[in-house]
């Protein structure tokens, strides 16, 4: 599953990053802020840690797995904080260009303001759920190993929406509605669920806990999506 998740991230972000880098070189968009690079390095490090931890368990090096896993207690908070800093940074980049940029930039970016305000919903949702699910996983690491290993993957699946939404060749409901992103995230975890179900002949508690939190949160995002009150709330949150 770790390899599968890394593949999703690469397929989503590499072409998008190459396109935007070319735009920066052509002067068609602002340079990437340093905060974006920091977040990318932290997320990449987390995914590689997840892969390494999976390989350690698969090769019966559990004592090393436990020692290396301590890194998550540093990496996860750093990743969450970086995300909380990055979201308003990218928001202000678009909002500032739409309101104070050159006329051509204002014309191009103004239609993106409502979109970026809606995307802020997804970013907040992903950040909160990732932190909650990782917290559940780490709390269960000693007493409930089955919950721990599954919840680590289920937590990691939540921010995959950022990569999936960049796969413009996929059928999508965006930007009108976020429901397609949720469907693709469910599909991303489905191989693990099916394998688990076939092997153990039951639905593990980790999936029940995850769905009990994930689905209401997704419904709340869908409810707030593109509502006038949400747009005004987003602008107040961002201080504009």
Q: What residue spans do the PLM features occupy?
A:
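Alpha-helical membrane insertion/targeting regions
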Residues: 1-240
């Amino acid at each position: 599953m770790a390899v599968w998740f890394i593949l999703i991230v690469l397929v989503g972000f590499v072409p998008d990053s190459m396109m935007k880098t070319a735009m920066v070189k052509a002067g068609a968009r602002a340079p990437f802020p340093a905060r974006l690079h920091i977040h990318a390095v932290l997320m990449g490090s987390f995914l590689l840690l997840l892969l390494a931890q999976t390989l350690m368990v698969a090769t019966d090096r559990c004592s090393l797995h436990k020692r290396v896993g301590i890194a998550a207690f540093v990496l996860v908070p750093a990743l969450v904080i970086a995300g909380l800093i990055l979201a308003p940074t990218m928001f202000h980049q678009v909002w500032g260009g739409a309101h104070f940029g050159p006329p051509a930039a204002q014309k191009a970016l103004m239609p993106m303001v409502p979109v970026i305000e809606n995307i802020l919903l997804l970013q907040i949702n992903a950040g909160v759920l990732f932190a909650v699910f990782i917290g559940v996983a780490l709390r269960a690491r000693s007493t409930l190993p089955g919950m721990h290993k599954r919840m680590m993957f289920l937590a990691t699946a939540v921010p995959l929406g950022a990569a999936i939404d960049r796969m413009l060749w996929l059928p999508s409901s965006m930007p009108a509605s976020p429901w397609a992103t949720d469907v693709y995230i469910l599909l991303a975890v489905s191989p693990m669920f099916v394998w688990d179900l076939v092997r153990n002949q039951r639905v593990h508690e980790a999936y029940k806990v995850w769905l009990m939190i994930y689905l209401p949160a997704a419904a709340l995002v869908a409810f707030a999506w593109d509502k006038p009150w949400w747009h005004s709330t987003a602008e107040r949150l961002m201080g504009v």
